[in-house]
UniProtKB/Swiss-Prot annotation:
This is Uncharacterized protein MJ1020. CDD domains: HDc (cd00077). InterPro entries: HD/PDEase_dom, HD_domain, MJ1020-like. Gene3D superfamilies: Hypothetical protein af1432. It comes from Methanocaldococcus jannaschii (strain ATCC 43067 / DSM 2661 / JAL-1 / JCM 10045 / NBRC 100440) (Methanococcus jannaschii). Residues 51-173 form the HD domain. PANTHER family: METAL-DEPENDENT PHOSPHOHYDROLASE, HD SUPERFAMILY-RELATED. SUPFAM superfamilies: HD-domain/PDEase-like (SSF109604). Pfam families: HD (PF01966).
């Protein structure tokens, strides 16, 4: 999976999840927040993509992992704790994943908190169109929990939140960077990020979810440990995820470096 993926999970949504996804991608407030998130993160801070493409990738991958877990007999938390349906959990995952980074439009610092309060009205207004009031409010709190806990250092307490956090970490291929690596300006972060060719999510043998990271250079191991590893650590679903890395074609990331 590179960043030119076809969003198979998003494109195959049906029923209420599809209607909500169609509404999300057309929502002017959501689109503006995502645009401003990239202006803040990429344009002003020199970070990687936190806009619409990132939102779609995280949503797609989170839904894929939720389905794998459900197939393996692991109930989503909203199903287990609130007597909801799998479709309800799918909606929670979709909304939480798509909106998790909109708080970057305010500031990168505590962006998970900014994302939660910016998402509140958006999520409530959407859910109240499809669900009775009490259920809409229940689902809203689950979405906000998932958004808030996607950041490292905050433990996810639901399956839905967990798959979103891990999915966030899977978007780490070299194509995510909107800032070309400056010649002779390399560090371990930029070299490692440039070494990630693609990420593949599939059913695992030892654990339900297997994430395979294909590298062009062993320097990418740093990115796996520092980005994806930290997301998994705090996701609350660590016991359900295994990660494998392999170098497909060893090639240099840089020719020379100046210290």
């Amino acid at each position: 999976m590179g960043r030119d993926m076809d969003f198979e999970e998003l494109n195959s949504l049906q029923g209420i999840p599809k209607m909500i996804y169609d509404e999300l991608i057309k929502n002017k407030k959501v689109n503006t927040f995502l645009k401003m998130s990239n202006i803040m993160a990429v344009g002003r801070l020199g970070y990687n993509d936190h806009g619409k493409t990132h939102a779609k990738i995280v949503a797609n991958n989170a839904i894929k992992m939720l389905k794998i877990l459900y197939k393996k007999g692991i109930e989503p938390s909203f199903v287990k704790d609130c007597k909801g349906s799998f479709e309800d959990s799918l909606v929670i995952t979709l909304l939480g994943a798509y909106l998790h980074d909109i708080g970057n439009s305010v500031h990168r610092d505590i962006h998970h908190l900014h994302s939660a309060y910016l998402a509140l009205d958006i999520v409530e207004n959407i859910l109240k169109k499809y669900y009775k009031e009490e259920k809409a409010y229940q689902m809203t709190t689950e979405v906000l929990h998932a958004i808030y806990s996607h950041s490292e250092g905050i433990m996810g307490l639901t399956i839905e939140a967990g798959v979103i956090a891990v999915a966030d970490g899977t978007d780490m291929t070299k194509g995510r960077s909107r800032i070309p690596i400056c010649k002779k300006c390399y560090d371990i972060h930029s070299v490692s990020a440039a070494s990630i060719e693609r990420v593949e999510i599939k059913e695992g043998d030892e654990k339900p979810i297997q994430i395979e990271v294909i590298l062009s250079n062993e320097a990418g191991i740093f990115q796996i440990q520092e980005v994806l590893g930290e997301k998994i650590k705090w996701s609350g679903i660590k016991n359900y995820v295994s990660v494998y890395a392999r170098v497909e074609k060893e090639k240099p990331v840089f020719e020379e470096i100046t210290i």
